[in-house]
């Protein structure tokens, strides 16, 4: 009988502070969540109708050590058990990113633990690996407040952006349309809920762009919604907000799903991964499931709602791959709000 050697588990501590969530997680072998703690600031930003960078940074300062201690306690481990610390280095709000990066550097230095920098969007993509093992080549549809892109991966750690937004990200368009309809921040979940009560009876544009393009554009759609509301007001016509929400949502989802499906076929991928905060959208999830149910050769992976919005488990998952590939950051690691995923 061959000798069985027990492989050592890789334990990664993830830290995420790119926007308005202070998050720390512990992940084993890149696939198993041991602890996942998130302190959200939505209530603090609600009255301003969006994230205020200065307020976000202050909250991160207050929360980071508390969340870090809570994650270690939940995972029932000490710093001695950790193989590496993975932290979001960008993109995001520079003041917010700095809190996480500096916390990660302090812990790495104090306990002599290797440090790995992670791209926030790589994290969103790797959230899917916490659900199911990924198979290459794959395509990820990334839809969040600041990003809307199609990312092709031929192997671990390799990211090729084959389509991206030329103006507003889908999440931005959701928030701006929600504001037009006098809905609270964040607008996405409110529009999603309202859309399910209405019918898409209002004719709104869809930006298909050039025939072979996988890029997106949502600024025209956003303007069309705002104009529709203003014109109706001026003419004294009542527009049902639920119908407007349904029409807007259908326009966004139609373009996202059609382009993702077209790209998945063209690039002959094995899986399509949904990623990012807007991945929590029920309408988008349902439409993707419907579209990919007919494609027997492409597996659709959709993360649970808790892994769609910003969290640190996804950063630890992406960080595991970087760590295993021998990537290391020095203590000179800095926040990079404009970090490129293809770099």
UniProtKB/Swiss-Prot annotation:
This is tRNA N6-adenosine threonylcarbamoyltransferase. Belongs to the KAE1 / TsaD family. Its cofactor is Fe(2+). It catalyses: L-threonylcarbamoyladenylate + adenosine(37) in tRNA = N(6)-L-threonylcarbamoyladenosine(37) in tRNA + AMP + H(+). Substrate binds at residues 142-146, 175, 188, 192, 281. Fe cation binds at residues 120, 124, 310. GO terms for cellular component: cytoplasm. Its EC number is 2.3.1.234. Binds 1 Fe(2+) ion per subunit. The lineage of its organism: Bacteria, Bacillati, Bacillota, Bacilli, Bacillales. GO terms for molecular function: iron ion binding; N(6)-L-threonylcarbamoyladenine synthase activity. InterPro entries: ATPase_NBD, Gcp-like_dom, KAE1/TsaD, Peptidase_M22_CS, TsaD. CDD domains: ASKHA_NBD_TsaD_bac. NCBIfam families: gcp_kae1 (TIGR00329), T6A_TsaD_YgjD (TIGR03723). It is found in: Cytoplasm. It comes from the Bacteria. SUPFAM superfamilies: Actin-like ATPase domain. It is an enzyme of class 2 (transferase). PANTHER family: TRNA N6-ADENOSINE THREONYLCARBAMOYLTRANSFERASE, TRNA N6-ADENOSINE THREONYLCARBAMOYLTRANSFERASE, MITOCHONDRIAL. Keywords: Acyltransferase, Cytoplasm, Iron, Metal-binding, Transferase, tRNA processing. Required for the formation of a threonylcarbamoyl group on adenosine at position 37 (t(6)A37) in tRNAs that read codons beginning with adenine. Is involved in the transfer of the threonylcarbamoyl moiety of threonylcarbamoyl-AMP (TC-AMP) to the N6 group of A37, together with TsaE and TsaB. TsaD likely plays a direct catalytic role in this reaction. The keyword Cytoplasm applies. The keyword Zinc-finger does not apply. GO terms for biological process: tRNA threonylcarbamoyladenosine modification.
């Amino acid at each position: 009988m061959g000798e069985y050697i027990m492989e050592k588990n890789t334990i990664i501590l993830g830290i995420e502070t790119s926007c308005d969530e202070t998050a720390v997680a512990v992940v084993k072998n890149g696939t198993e969540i041991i602890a996942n703690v998130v302190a959200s600031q939505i209530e603090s930003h609600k009255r301003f109708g969006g994230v205020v960078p200065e307020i976000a940074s202050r909250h991160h300062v207050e929360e980071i050590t508390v969340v870090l201690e809570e994650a270690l306690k939940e995972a029932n481990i000490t710093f001695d058990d950790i193989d590496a610390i993975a932290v979001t280095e960008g993109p995001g709000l520079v003041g917010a990113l700095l809190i996480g990066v500096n916390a990660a550097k302090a812990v790495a230095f104090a306990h002599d633990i290797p440090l790995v920098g992670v791209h926030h969007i790589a994290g969103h993509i790797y959230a899917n690996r916490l659900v199911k093992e990924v198979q290459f080549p794959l395509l990820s549809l990334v839809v969040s407040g600041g990003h809307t892109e199609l990312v092709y991966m031929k192997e671990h750690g390799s990211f090729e952006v084959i389509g991206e937004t030329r103006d507003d990200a889908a999440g931005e368009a959701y928030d701006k349309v929600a504001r037009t309809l006098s809905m609270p921040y964040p607008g996405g979940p409110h529009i999603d809920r309202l859309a399910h009560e209405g019918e898409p009876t209002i004719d709104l544009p869809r930006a298909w762009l050039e025939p072979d393009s996988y890029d997106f554009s949502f600024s025209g759609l956003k303007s069309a919604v705002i104009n529709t509301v203003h014109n109706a007001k001026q003419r004294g016509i009542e527009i049902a907000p639920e119908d407007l929400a349904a029409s807007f949502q259908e326009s966004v989802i139609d373009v996202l799903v059609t382009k993702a499906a077209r790209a998945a076929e063209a690039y002959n991928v094995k899986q399509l991964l949904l990623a990012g905060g807007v991945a929590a959208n029920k309408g988008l999830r349902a439409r993707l499931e419907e579209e990919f149910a007919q494609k027997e050769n492409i597996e659709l992976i959709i993360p649970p709602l808790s892994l769609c919005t910003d969290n640190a488990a996804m950063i630890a998952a992406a960080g595991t791959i970087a760590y295993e590939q021998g990537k290391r950051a020095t203590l000179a690691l800095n926040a990079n709000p404009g970090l490129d995923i293809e770099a």
